């Protein structure tokens, strides 16, 4: 009897389960909603991830997956705070160019160049309909930041970006260039004379450790980007140039006030930091499209000055040394609304796969005066120049140490000076480029945004080449001094000095206890860890390293007795002898690195400083030191500077700069726009 009842019971349960499964139908899903939000990702209203200025343009996008391969998404609409968004929604399926894992019938719904004027927290909803009539919806949120009515508006914004420059890099440069006497600085760095300093949190949208692309774009878009992305939110396509865009500070101020944009760097101009002020791409390495966008979208950004390295992107592919190629370029479809709306609604250029384009000639045809070296830069009359293009190397410019040694005729290269080996012996210093940029931009009566980057503070910290990043920090500070002098006495210019992130976990561990001659002897002995034990002085043994500064503003030599000693926290394996490296590591961005004389340069961290036989085991994999997640200092000068105190997010910088440029400087009370605070419920 019990056995019979048990069988009936099991049959009854199985039947109920089967009936229940028939009642649960598959449904389409929304896997991404842009702008990004915690409301969409985790069901929490806070923290608010995306923030915008009133009227700042940005794209909306949703990725929608049907519940079966034989079904389609036939419509999608967006609404804001319960009201339908009337702007056209472009639908694109994933038959091609979507990321792995998305079915071919997945659909992207996009609204381009959307904006909201009303400040406050807004709820965004997307509703989609499947071919069988099923519907799906999802919601997220974003904030439009309130700007406070102030007094005088700032005309000019100068952003000085020391790539990878943390507090330790600033301190090291102060010790070398300024010197200490009984614990007091003898000559302060220019950046140390700014009246206001705060600390900046540097995380990107997808990591606590940012790279340079989102590190820069956070400052000039007000939003987090993924690593490797510039001025865009992430999406689900493989196209590097179709991502949802965010309007930059330069674009917003050019559109609303007519301001010009200047970009000055010691890197290749396609690099992350300069591009992160004017270019929209999810791939910081797509150089051909990046430099084309500089020129073709200058009507959006107001680009008037562009200086640095990177000539390889401006030469037709047939010219030796050119890096142009269709694989790093773009051409938007004129019939597919997904990209056609970038052209139609943003006013962006359509692009073209044109590896044989002579971009250098096109810049000149557009009215840019071109300079290829310091000598020609010096001859340019800024009173007669509205637009300036300077390209001083095929890729990254040589670093300050090698440029200074070149000017001093110090032979360190294979065929002469290092700058001779690279083929560009007459490169300007960063301060010389900055001076000319300011003189040209000063002609723009509606004002300007100027970004100046000390790029190889980061690049040489990656290589753990202490003296090279040290002198690049000094070079950067000389540019800071010029920017401060320009703003001094004016009431219309704000200057900020900061970094996108820290690089290499630089630690000032002390000073050498021996003379340079003794250090050389220890290296020749190949004494390994005994080298460290005799040389490294900590605490009072470090003393005060004393560098003699030449009339050009740089140390006469970096190989002094009792030198400063630097360690690295995010280091890869390396050989170390504590002396200045005669040559930099090979730069794989240079077109002729694998040819002599550049091929004779050290190929990596374990290929240099071998004589001393002292190897330091790294804490990170690979062959390079890495960025760190530590906060970085920000110093400010000029009207509105006092908004930059405290510990702030990197995206806050954008809104503080916008405040003084759009609504004017306000008193300390109520000066800083306060983001909307939303109660975050604990996760279940």
List each language-model region with its residue ranges.
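Bacterial N-terminal signal peptides
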Residues: 13-21
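Short, compositionally biased P/S/T/A/G/V-rich stretches that sit at domain boundaries
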Residues: 26-54
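Aromatic/hydrophobic beta-strand junction motif of beta-rich domains
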Residues: 58-68
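Solvent-exposed serine/threonine-rich low-complexity stretches and specific carbohydrate-binding patches
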Residues: 81-104
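A post-motif C-terminal structural segment
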Residues: 94-101, 155, 162-217, 270-683
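Short, hydrophobic beta-strand segments
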Residues: 102-118, 144
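Exposed beta-strand face motif in extracellular beta-rich ectodomains
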Residues: 120-124
């Amino acid at each position: 009897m019990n056995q019979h009842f048990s069988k009936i019971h099991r049959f009854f349960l199985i039947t109920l389960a089967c009936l229940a499964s028939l009642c649960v139908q598959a449904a389409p899903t929304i896997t991404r909603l842009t702008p990004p939000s915690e409301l969409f990702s985790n069901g929490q209203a806070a923290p608010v991830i995306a923030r915008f200025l009133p009227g700042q343009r940005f794209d909306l996008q949703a990725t929608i997956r049907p519940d079966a391969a034989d079904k389609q998404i036939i419509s999608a609409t967006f609404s804001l705070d319960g009201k339908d968004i009337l702007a056209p929604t472009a639908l694109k399926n994933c038959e091609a160019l979507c990321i792995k894992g998305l079915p071919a019938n997945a659909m992207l719904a996009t609204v381009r160049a959307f904006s909201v004027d009303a400040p406050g927290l807004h709820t965004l909803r997307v509703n989609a309909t499947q071919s069988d009539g099923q519907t799906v919806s999802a919601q997220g949120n974003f904030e439009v930041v309130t700007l406070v009515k102030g007094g005088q508006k700032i005309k000019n914004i100068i952003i000085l970006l020391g790539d990878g420059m943390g507090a330790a890099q600033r301190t090291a440069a102060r010790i070398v260039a300024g010197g200490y006497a009984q614990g007091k600085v003898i000559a302060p760095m220019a950046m140390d004379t700014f009246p206001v300093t705060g600390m900046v949190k540097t995380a990107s949208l997808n990591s606590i450790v940012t790279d340079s692309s989102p590190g820069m774009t956070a400052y000039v878009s007000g939003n987090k980007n993924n690593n490797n992305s510039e001025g865009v939110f992430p999406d689900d396509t493989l196209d590097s140039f179709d991502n949802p865009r965010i309007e930059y500070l330069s674009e917003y101020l050019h559109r609303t006030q007519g301001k010009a944009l200047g970009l000055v760097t010691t890197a290749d101009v396609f690099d992350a930091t300069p591009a992160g002020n004017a270019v929209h791409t999810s791939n910081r390495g797509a150089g051909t499209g990046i430099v084309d966008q500089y020129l073709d979208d200058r009507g959006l950004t107001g680009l008037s000055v562009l200086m640095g390295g990177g000539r390889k992107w401006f030469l037709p592919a047939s010219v030796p040394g050119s890096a142009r190629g269709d694989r790093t370029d773009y051409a938007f479809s004129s019939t597919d609304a997904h990209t056609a709306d970038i052209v139609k609604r943003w006013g962006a250029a359509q692009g073209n796969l044109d590896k044989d384009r002579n971009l250098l000639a096109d810049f000149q045809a557009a009215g840019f005066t071109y300079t290829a070296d310091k000598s020609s830069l010096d001859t340019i009359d800024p009173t007669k120049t509205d637009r300036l293009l300077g390209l001083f190397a095929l890729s990254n410019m040589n670093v300050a140490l090698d440029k200074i040694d070149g000017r001093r005729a110090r032979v360190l290269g294979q065929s002469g000076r290092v700058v001779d080996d690279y083929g560009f012996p007459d490169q300007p210093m960063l301060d010389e480029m900055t001076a000319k940029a300011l003189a040209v931009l000063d002609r723009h009566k509606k004002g300007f945004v100027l970004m100046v980057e000390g790029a190889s503070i980061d690049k040489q910290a990656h290589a753990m080449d202490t003296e090279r990043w040290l002198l690049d920090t000094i070079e950067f500070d000389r540019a800071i001094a010029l920017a401060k002098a320009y703003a001094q006495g004016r009431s219309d210019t704000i200057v900020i000095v900061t970094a996108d992130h820290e690089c290499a976990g630089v630690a000032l561990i002390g000073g050498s206890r021996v003379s340079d001659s003794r250090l050389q002897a220890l290296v020749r002995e190949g004494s390994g860890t005994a080298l460290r034990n005799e040389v490294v002085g900590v605490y009072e043994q470090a003393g005060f390293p004393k560098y003699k500064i030449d009339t050009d503003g740089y140390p006469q030599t970096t190989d002094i007795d009792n030198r400063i000693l630097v360690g690295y926290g995010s280091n890869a394996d390396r050989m170390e002898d504590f002396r200045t490296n005669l040559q930099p590591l090979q730069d794989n961005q240079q077109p002729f690195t694998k040819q002599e004389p550049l091929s004779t340069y050290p190929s990596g961290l374990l290929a240099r400083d071998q004589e001393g036989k002292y190897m330091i085991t790294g804490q990170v994999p690979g062959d390079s030191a890495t960025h760190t997640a530590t906060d970085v200092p920000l110093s400010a000068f000029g009207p509105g500077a006092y908004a930059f105190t405290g510990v702030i997010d990197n995206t806050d910088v954008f809104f503080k700069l916008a405040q003084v440029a759009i609504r004017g400087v306000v008193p300390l009370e109520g000066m800083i726009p306060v983001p909307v605070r939303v109660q975050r419920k604990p996760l279940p």
